[in-house]
Amino acid sequence: MDQSKMRYTNQFRKTPQKPTSTEVGNHHTPAHSPMAQHETSMWNFNSLNPYFSMLNMNDGMNYARHQQNHIVTSRPPTPLTDLMSLRSFQSFPNVFMPVSRSRTSSFIQSDTDSSRLEPDDFSQNVRYCSTEIDRNNSSSKNDHLKYSRPALSRNSRSFTRSNNVLPTWSLDSNGEMRSRLSLSEVLDSGDLMKFAVDKTGCQFLEKAVKGSLTSYQKFQLFEQVIGRKDDFLKLSTNIFGNYFVQEIIGMSLTTYDDDNIKRQEKLKNFISSQMTDMCLDKFACRVIQSSLQNMDLSLACKLVQALPRDARLIAICVDQNANHVIQKVVAVIPLKNWEFIVDFVATPEHLRQICFDKYGCRVVQTIIEKLTADSINVDLTSAAQHLRERALQRLMTSVTNRCQELATNEYANYIIQHIVSNDDLAVYRECIIEKCLMRNLLSLSQEKFASHVVEKAFLHAPMELLAEMMDEIFDGYMPHPGTGKDALDIMMFHQFGNYVVQCMLTICCDAVSGRRQTKEGSYDHANSFQVWLKKLHSRVTKERHRLSRFSSGKKMIETLAHLRSTHPIYGLQSSGHESFKTDCFSTASEHDGLELEKNGIEEGNLRLMRTFSP
């Protein structure tokens, strides 16, 4: 039977639709005509929701009088088959073809696996339906019946379920787990796997193993969970079973008997044989992390050596789940056992792929944080410190060589921000500022992501480099020959550059008000901050009408007004200039606002000529 002749009722339909309409579900067929030769059709009412009662059943009966039509229902009964017992349905006994499937009701939600229609059930249904159709319609022997998998309801949790169900002996007459079920019964029955992959069963097991257990019960648990590789891998990759596996691993590693090391060896071998696949699995990656955390250190180090050294390691670093395995390795394993990861990441072609990824950038940042934190670890030997310094230098050299490309990336910019903000990485911070940012401040300030890096550089740069950066913004670029706009003008009204100007203004205000240290060594740079503040004040005063139209401009005005009110001794208050009163900016004309919008588009693309040679 052609698929085009199948009719499917629409799930969650709230408006009545007649069976003879031209649209049923997603299939379009011409409306029924008494004059035309009727074709064999099939209706599938198995996925109906309570709104099915709104169907016009009289029209349905008129359509069903054609003996070549078939209405497919379920057994056990659905509400439609309940209606079949009515008097109006009794004249159509051959029309309705019950299709068996393992489900109690189309409407009743269930936490058991019986609420899911599996591929095997579909194949059985198709064979049964094909037999019945051929029996009643010999002309349709060459037709093919195809089923599409019904969509899961909003509240359905069957997509998280295993194919297994709890054994019948563990259930009461209501289909619920017996209240007096014991762990010993489960272990002796050999059905532990079925419990571990079921939500209710797994909760029962987790609660049971936290109680007092005999030595024999522990032995049974270890054998049935981590004793066989196939069972271990199946549970590790299961949404519920992985939690139970983690419980048993923790119990196994803290049970100090004669078989403790043997169990750990077996566990290490199981994971090593499927290391990449388990790392990439949403649930098994948690089992690996738990093993690394609790396993004997020597065996955990051997487990790390099972990580690949090829493109698969990139896949692990950038995977949503597997990246946490790398971070766990970095956190709990000595550097000498994962130094190969640093070398792999520091390779230029690998660094770009990993840093440009949402999860990979976090892996690189975690490595940098670990290598930096260990610099003050007094427990490390001199050899370990030397190894740490070499690894950090290799990674930082690779990062600084690509710092401008990384600074403009959506994710990699966080790595550069972290380096610039960390005082323990001051050497590499200065290298990034000199090599990447200087002579590019105007262009980078207009980049969405690089502007954050420029802000961090202004906040954390040493005085010598800060002075060079300030001078570059104020005097480092020639004004545009056509508009006369300089770098500060462009940045003040740019959607990203204005944040850099706000940062510059905040730095100067904090220094003048005493909230920022102005001494570096034996020299006090307070005068430099006052000079920079006067330049910013002058420009904000000049552009106050335009700035008052935007929230960023209002913040600059408010910052200077607050400084004047709290610290009137910084050198600008004597003029009594009204620009520091925020209420005076409300008189700006509408023309100024329109002119700002017009100029903003042009200024956004400007790149002024540098007054210095690179």
UniProtKB/Swiss-Prot annotation:
<dbReference type="GO" id="GO:0048471">
    <property type="term" value="C:perinuclear region of cytoplasm"/>
</dbReference>
<dbReference type="InterPro" id="IPR001313">
    <property type="entry name" value="Pumilio_RNA-bd_rpt"/>
</dbReference>
<dbReference type="GO" id="GO:0005737">
    <property type="term" value="C:cytoplasm"/>
</dbReference>
<comment type="subunit">
    <text>Interacts (via C-terminus) with gld-3 isoform A in an RNA-independent manner.</text>
</comment>
<keyword id="KW-0726">Sexual differentiation</keyword>
<dbReference type="GO" id="GO:0010628">
    <property type="term" value="P:positive regulation of gene expression"/>
</dbReference>
<dbReference type="InterPro" id="IPR033133">
    <property type="entry name" value="PUM-HD"/>
</dbReference>
<dbReference type="GO" id="GO:0003730">
    <property type="term" value="F:mRNA 3'-UTR binding"/>
</dbReference>
<keyword id="KW-0694">RNA-binding</keyword>
<feature type="region of interest" description="Disordered">
    <location>
        <begin position="1"/>
        <end position="34"/>
    </location>
</feature>
<comment type="function">
    <text>RNA-binding protein that binds to the consensus sequence 5'-UGUGCCAUA-3' in mRNA 3'-UTRs. Involved in the control of stem cells and sex determination in the C.elegans hermaphrodite germline. May also play a role in the hermaphrodite germline proliferation and oogenesis. Binds specifically to the regulatory region of fem-3 3'-UTR and mediates the sperm/oocyte switch. Negatively regulates gld-3 expression, possibly by directly binding to two sites within the 3'-UTR of gld-3 isoform b.</text>
</comment>
<feature type="compositionally biased region" description="Polar residues">
    <location>
        <begin position="1"/>
        <end position="24"/>
    </location>
</feature>
<feature type="repeat" description="Pumilio 5">
    <location>
        <begin position="343"/>
        <end position="382"/>
    </location>
</feature>
<keyword id="KW-0677">Repeat</keyword>
<feature type="repeat" description="Pumilio 6">
    <location>
        <begin position="398"/>
        <end position="434"/>
    </location>
</feature>
<dbReference type="GO" id="GO:0010608">
    <property type="term" value="P:post-transcriptional regulation of gene expression"/>
</dbReference>
<feature type="repeat" description="Pumilio 8">
    <location>
        <begin position="483"/>
        <end position="519"/>
    </location>
</feature>
<protein>
    <recommendedName>
        <fullName>Fem-3 mRNA-binding factor 1</fullName>
    </recommendedName>
</protein>
<feature type="repeat" description="Pumilio 4">
    <location>
        <begin position="306"/>
        <end position="342"/>
    </location>
</feature>
<feature type="repeat" description="Pumilio 2">
    <location>
        <begin position="224"/>
        <end position="263"/>
    </location>
</feature>
<dbReference type="GO" id="GO:0043073">
    <property type="term" value="C:germ cell nucleus"/>
</dbReference>
<feature type="repeat" description="Pumilio 3">
    <location>
        <begin position="269"/>
        <end position="305"/>
    </location>
</feature>
<feature type="domain" description="PUM-HD">
    <location>
        <begin position="160"/>
        <end position="564"/>
    </location>
</feature>
<feature type="region of interest" description="Binding to gld-3 isoform A">
    <location>
        <begin position="283"/>
        <end position="614"/>
    </location>
</feature>
<dbReference type="GO" id="GO:0008355">
    <property type="term" value="P:olfactory learning"/>
</dbReference>
<feature type="repeat" description="Pumilio 7">
    <location>
        <begin position="436"/>
        <end position="471"/>
    </location>
</feature>
<dbReference type="GO" id="GO:0017148">
    <property type="term" value="P:negative regulation of translation"/>
</dbReference>
<keyword id="KW-0221">Differentiation</keyword>
<dbReference type="InterPro" id="IPR011989">
    <property type="entry name" value="ARM-like"/>
</dbReference>
<dbReference type="GO" id="GO:0007548">
    <property type="term" value="P:sex differentiation"/>
</dbReference>
<dbReference type="GO" id="GO:0001555">
    <property type="term" value="P:oocyte growth"/>
</dbReference>
<dbReference type="Pfam" id="PF00806">
    <property type="entry name" value="PUF"/>
</dbReference>
<dbReference type="InterPro" id="IPR016024">
    <property type="entry name" value="ARM-type_fold"/>
</dbReference>
<dbReference type="GO" id="GO:0051729">
    <property type="term" value="P:germline cell cycle switching, mitotic to meiotic cell cycle"/>
</dbReference>
<keyword id="KW-0963">Cytoplasm</keyword>
<keyword id="KW-0217">Developmental protein</keyword>
<dbReference type="GO" id="GO:0005634">
    <property type="term" value="C:nucleus"/>
</dbReference>
<feature type="repeat" description="Pumilio 1">
    <location>
        <begin position="185"/>
        <end position="223"/>
    </location>
</feature>
